[in-house]
Amino acid sequence: MENKKFEEKPSEGRRNFLQAGGMALLGLAMPEAISAKPRAAESLAMSGGPKAVHFPADKLEALTRWPRYGQAEKDALHRLIDTDMFYEELPLFEKEWQAYTGIPYLRAHINGSSAITSMLFAIDLEPGSEIMVPSYDFPTDVLAMRFFSYVPIFIDISPTTGTFDLEDARRKMTSRTRAVFPMHSWGMPCDMDHIRDFAKEKDLIVLEDAAHAHGASMQGKKMGTWGDLAIFSFQASKVLPTVEGGMGMYH
């Protein structure tokens, strides 16, 4: 009897059957994939395409304008100019900020960067000491360290809050680490209770960047009062703007 070889390719009838069966199964699992019509490509609005949101430009500018000053602020500025006593208001501001935060020692600065530099000077660490900072941070927190030969250790940020990730800090702790320097991104408080516990356990100084966190609090305790030292900024983009200014705070 003559031996016949099997065909390596399925017959046309079998191929059509398999294709039809596969499409039927795909249709059961993903009916929208079969029934959906292809969408026409659209250009982005910036490239001349249709806008997804329509909002009057004048209203948008009014809503997003910052900083905002009212008549009270304008009157206070006029009084300052008329009296020609430019520096008399500063001690009053320090006194009011001290009463608001409950911090015993503080000093106003020309800006937040100056307050940060003063804070890093005050801790008086040895050159080469490591300070943990979030990887998403304002440059001054790191740049000011170079004045004192401190070494920044960049800590990952939490994907849910955008703030200092304590678990990553635990992994990157070394024998040279001397301080942690968390920042409250966009005013979102870091987990300062856990950070303080970690710092106490490892004998670390807590430096708190509260530049964005005016008025924010956690567990009834204001941000800027959790650290051994802390700073605020009053730059024009901040929650409490004075065009420029900063505050250094010390327990």
Locations of the language-model features?
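PLP-dependent aminotransferase-like
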Residues: 45, 121-210, 217
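C-terminal segment of N-terminal export signals and the immediately downstream linker at the start
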Residues: 32-87, 95, 99
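Phosphate-binding glycine-rich loop
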Residues: 89-130, 144, 154, 221
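Conserved active-site segment immediately N-terminal to the catalytic lysine
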Residues: 208-242, 247
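N-terminal export leaders
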Residues: 12-30
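N-terminal secretory signal peptides
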Residues: 1-12
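Conserved SAM-binding loop
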Residues: 108, 133, 248
